[in-house]
From Swiss-Prot:
Gene behind this protein: rps18
Coiled coil (residue ranges): none
Region (Disordered): 1-54, 121-163
Subunit relationships: Part of the 30S ribosomal subunit.
Listed SUPFAM superfamilies: Ribosomal protein S18 (SSF46911)
Molecular function terms, GO-annotated: small ribosomal subunit rRNA binding; structural constituent of ribosome
Organism: Oryza sativa subsp. indica
Ranges of Basic residues composition bias in the record: 7-48
UniProt KW keywords: Chloroplast, Plastid, Repeat, Ribonucleoprotein, Ribosomal protein, RNA-binding, rRNA-binding
Lineage: Eukaryota, Viridiplantae, Streptophyta, Embryophyta, Tracheophyta
Cellular localization per UniProt: Plastid, Chloroplast
Sequence repeat segments: 4-10, 11-17, 18-24, 25-31, 32-38, 39-45
Extent of Low complexity compositional bias: 140-163
Protein name according to UniProt: Small ribosomal subunit protein bS18c
Gene Ontology CC entries for this record: chloroplast; mitochondrial small ribosomal subunit; plastid
Amino acid sequence: MYTSKQPFHKSKQTFHKSKQTFRKSKQTFRKFKQPFRKPKQPFRRRPRIGPGDRIDYRNMSLINRFISEQGKILSRRINRLTLKQQRLITLAIKQARILSFLPFRNYENEKQFQAQSISIITGPRPRKNRHIPPLTQKFNSNRNLRNSNQTLRNNNRNLSSDC
């Protein structure tokens, strides 16, 4: 192994790599890129709460917009409210419920909802073709015999103890 006592010096000449290949690839990339198109009409959702609307438990017209048919508070995703607005709406709804401006549940719509869900659950079901294998039938009949024999023995014991 060769080791020199002299320190390593970098060469003064710089390495020039041809930049031509890089430029070519950049040009082909630009060809495929589509220009950015600005939409013709700016699309912006209007907020459900206007600047003049006051979030208060007495403002029933505003509060009713944020309650579902069953009387539940709608989520932020559905309401499109900010976190602060949602918090204020929730507090206002809860205050209105406590002060009995609002019902805790909307029973009329809830009954309709329950009736629909029950009809979906208990609707006509296809009957299952129950086939019990013969071994299981035999086992069940033997078990029934054993149970009846056991009850007869118990009855006989009770009768003999009474005498």
